[in-house]
Amino acid sequence: MLNYNHTIKEEKSYQGLQMIEMKPVMKLIVRGKKREFLSAIGKSLNMVLPTKANTSTQSEKLTALWLSPDEWMIFSNGVVKENTNSYDTETLLNKNISKLDLGAVVDVTDQFVRINLKGDKIYNLFQTGSPFNFNDFKNKIGSVTQTILAKIDVIIHNQNKNEVNLFVRRSFSEHLFAWMND
């Protein structure tokens, strides 16, 4: 059973910036190159994986982030039950992808923390700790980047205007959250 420990204990709000850990959210990494892999994902999840670099696709229940030409992160849009390690999406993909040797499916729910940031000061915060140029990124809804923030590897997903999802490894999440609150 999932022993989910919240790394970020509270929601933080400042003028122009709000930060909260979205908990718990199912997160999977899927990898594959074959056309059959992409087709099986589409049929299984009723969504198409993004094939253009640094983009995302979204359905009612799931979002897929492009990480590399053969790697995507799929996460649930809503919270999942904390009393289980079993996710219907993972079970379905294991059956239709892994067992047919079309690709790999890895549960990274416990590995990554998802922090939702809202407000018009998000990119001011990011620019103080990242070498990435956010000028074009912030105007493209659904764009994705993997970058460094305060010397920590992160995945940033531009959800909406002035709203982003930031994925960080659990072991670095408290440090990053403290840096963002400083």
What is each model feature region?
Residues 1-182:
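Basic, glycine/lysine-rich polyanion-binding surfaces/domains
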